[in-house]
Amino acid sequence: MGKPLKSVFKKEHRDDVSNPSANPVFSSVAEMFLSRRRFLQMGAVAGAAASFPFLLKPENALAAVSQPSALSKAVSLGFTSIPVSTDDTVRVPEGYIARPFYRWGDATGIKGNMPEFKFDASNTADEQAAQAGMHHDGMAWFSLPQGEENPGHGLLAMNHEYIDNGMLFTDGTASWNLDKARKGQNAMGVSIIEVKKSGSDWEVVRPSGFARRITVNTPMQLTGPARQQTLMKTAADPQGERVLGTMQNCANGYTPWGTYLTCEENWSDIFVKKGERNALEKRYGISDSDESYRWSEVDDRFNVDKTPNEPNRFGWVVEIDPYNPDSTPRKHTALGRFKHEGAAVTLAADKRVVTYMGDDQKFEYIYKFVSDNKYNPADRDANLQLLTAGTLYVARFNDDGSGEWLPLVFGQNGLDKSKGFESQGDLLVKTRLAADAVGATKMDRPEWIAVDPHNSGSVYCTLTNNSDRGKEGKAPVDAANPRANNAFGHIMHWHEEGGDPAALRFKWDILVLAGRTDTADEKAKGSMKGAEFGSPDGLSFDHQGVLWIQ
């Protein structure tokens, strides 16, 4: 008989705390800087759907803090908001329809390999590698033909974040073996599917020369300073240049040159070490048990006692070329190693590439990467190298509303051998420890980041929640987070100096506190008029400059 059902659900290690540093927490910084009157009071808000309920037009947000009359009104999108409900059903506004499109087990569309889904869960591991994975998450659109704007035909790149073992097999987790682990590994990763509009409906093109599945066992290349570092070498890869697979792919990003960025988030859930954990393993949340995935029981890659450096090969941003199904995905170590939620890409004033990233765990940090070289729209081959070299920064939020980006560079700010760093590559494997050392500001689970396409240097970040707020030994309640056991979260905004994303200084403020509208309790009340929401996560601008919040 399999393990109890409760043991096969996803374990939320993002809810653990792995940061023991004495760095300032954002709540205490915000308390010194903000007062209740400074929160933006948003007016009319349109509700889009149960999963994307709020739309804001936050132009010139910082100016609006001191000049409330300057706030732009929310844009009406022409449909009626969906009321709050606990019904177990998908609901959309009147005049819209929703239907399943690409379900777990649907054929991806790979030529000559399109297995049908078997509802008794008897599909093999090899069949799963040609089918949609489980638990879809971040995704991005790439028009076809390449280089043209075509809203009716394109490629959809989609993450498959995690799995439920209890649903993958006919007998659940009984008689656990390597083949079962392989099927689970093939149900994670990324799908590339070709989609096309047909009349008023959409269809997945099958077969397609673009169709592809990327899984936990797909060969990948390592790039950047951590390539060939001692901490990246294993018996299977003694040079530290190649790695198998990507997993726990949460949010995403996309580049101006037409590639997909998939982000490895809760990868530490997979690894188990029974022996004593070192400081690096503790800082990244490596555990001594795993009742959810159980790969470490049958696959030594995920048994840290046997393969100690394998965890170091995860926690990166992976670049995939959706237009070239024969290309090798690349893990870009220059962008740092942590629990990447997403990667928001924009261009600096001088055309260098800037990528904003959040580390989605309690009291972790916000980062940005600035490339060494510049984007050239006429040279895609050169652009494909832009994320291999540059400078990684981590944010510090000061109590006067200013902020600065602190470089994580070997030999600067005390980041040297005396602090346990051997080189730039070694430092990037230990990104969290480097951010601790320079005094970055602890945040409340940074999730998605969105760059305003109509206001250069204006950036927004969801801080989803923090149930440890106010607990003994943790950050206290404060003006910016006025509730213990903060279940609602907030959204923050910063504007880079001079409107340049590559700037090293910025001004910050709070866009909105999430919460309820039916209470006068300041510990639970949101600051947005006319609507309520909690635990903001996904964040994206549309072509009108409307900010969509999940």
What are these regions (language model features)?
Residues 188-195, 286, 313-322, 369-370, ...:
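Beta-propeller blade signature
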Residues 32, 38-64:
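N-terminal export signals
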Residues 89-100, 113-127, 200-240, 320-337, ...:
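Blade-edge beta-strand/turn elements of extracellular beta-propeller
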